[in-house]
Amino acid sequence: MSQYSFTSESVSEGHPDKIADQISDAILDSILAQDPRARVACETYVKTGIVIMGGEITTTAWVNMEEIARNTIRDIGYVHSDMGFDANSCVILSVINKQSSDIQYSIDHGNTSTLQRGAGDQGLMFGYATNETSVFMPAPITYAHRLIKRKSQVRKSGVLPWLGLDAKSQVTVAYEHGKIIGITAVVLSIQHACDIKLTDLKEAAMEEIIKPVLPNKWLTNNTIFLINPGGRFVIGGPISDCGLTGRKIIVDTYGGIGRHGGGSFSGKDPSKVDRSAAYGARYVAKNIVAAGLADRCELQVSYAIGVPHPISMSIETFGTEKISHDILMQLIKNFFDFRPYGLIAMLDLLRPIYKETAVYGHFGRECFPWEKIDKADLLRDAAGLKCTP
C-alpha cells in the first residue's frame, strides 16, 4: 500500500485515567525514594468525590498514601468542590496487601546474585522506534502528545485560563511509501468554562495550541480541524467518567503503530518486566535506528515467572534493515542485558522517576534513561557500518 494514513490520540493530565496513573506512580516514587528495593504494584480508581487505591506492596518504607494522593490531585488542579472532584474533600480509601510470598520466592528463590533473580511474571513486551521524527517516535502520537502538553501550558500560564483540566487530542498523518506527506485531520476536545463561546474556543485553540505545535509544512487547505466537535464540554474529569490505572496503554506507548503486549506501566516497580522490559526494548530499538542499522525497528521480548533470561526475543524492521536480522539479534545479545535485574542496572531504574512518565507518554522524551542513544556508535561500529545515519 503506497498511500495510507494513521491516527493516534493523547489525553491530558486531568483526564480521569491519567489522574489514576499519576497517583499510582506518585506512590511508587515516594516508596522508591526510601526503599529502592521495594516491590510495588499500586492500582488507583477515581470517580466523583472518591479515590480507591489497591494493590500489593512489600517495603521497609513508610509513606502517607492519602497525603500523596491528595497532593497529586492538587497539583493536577482539582481543588474546588464545584469541579466534582476536589483534592481537599474527596474520600480516599486504601486496600493494600503485601506481595504474595509465592511470587517473591519465584523471583529470588535463594539466589545470592541479584542478576540471577527471575522475572516476577510471564508476559510479552514490545519496543519500537522510527526515524520519522527527531525523537525516534511515530509522528501521530508525538504530535498528539505535544498538542495536549501545549494545552496544559497555555492554561497554567494564564494565556487561556478558562480552559478546563480534561482534554483529548487526535492526529491523523498521511504517508506515501512510508514517508510523511501531511497531516490530514486534527481533533481536539477541551473542557472549558461555562461562559465561553464555542467560536472563541475554536479560534483560541487554533492560534494558541494547534499552530504553535504542528509543522506548517504538513498542513494543507485540505487538513480537517475538529475542535470540540461534540460542542459544549463543561462537565469533565472524574465527575464525567471514572478513571483507572493502566487504561491508556496505547497513549502511553506508540499510539498503536508499535504493537503492545498488554501490560500497563504505572504503579509498578521496575522488578515488573511489564514495565522494565518495555523500557529496555524501546532502548534497544531506538539505538538501532539511531545507529542507522534500520529506519524502523520493533523488538519483542517474553518472560516466564521465576526465570531470569528471556524465553524469546524477536526483531522486525519492516524491510528497512541495513544488516541482517541475525546480525542485529547477535548485537542485541552482545550489548544489552535483558535479565530483569540486568535491565534495572543498565537503565538505573531503582529511582523515583516514574510520576513524570504518567502523562504525555513514556517514550520520546529525553529526560528518561531508556531514551538515551549512548550505544548507537557502538552498534554501528560493531556492525561495520562507517556512515552516519
From Swiss-Prot:
Domain of life: Bacteria
Subunit structure: Homotetramer; dimer of dimers.
The protein, known as: S-adenosylmethionine synthase
One Gene Ontology CC term in the entry: cytoplasm
Gene Ontology MF: a single term: magnesium ion binding
Classification via InterPro entries: ADOMET_SYNTHASE_CS, S-AdoMet_synt_C, S-AdoMet_synt_central, S-AdoMet_synt_N, S-AdoMet_synthetase, S-AdoMet_synthetase_sfam
UniProt keyword Ribonucleoprotein, yes or no: no
Binding locations of Mg(2+): 17
Keywords on record: ATP-binding, Cytoplasm, Magnesium, Metal-binding, Nucleotide-binding, One-carbon metabolism, Potassium, Transferase
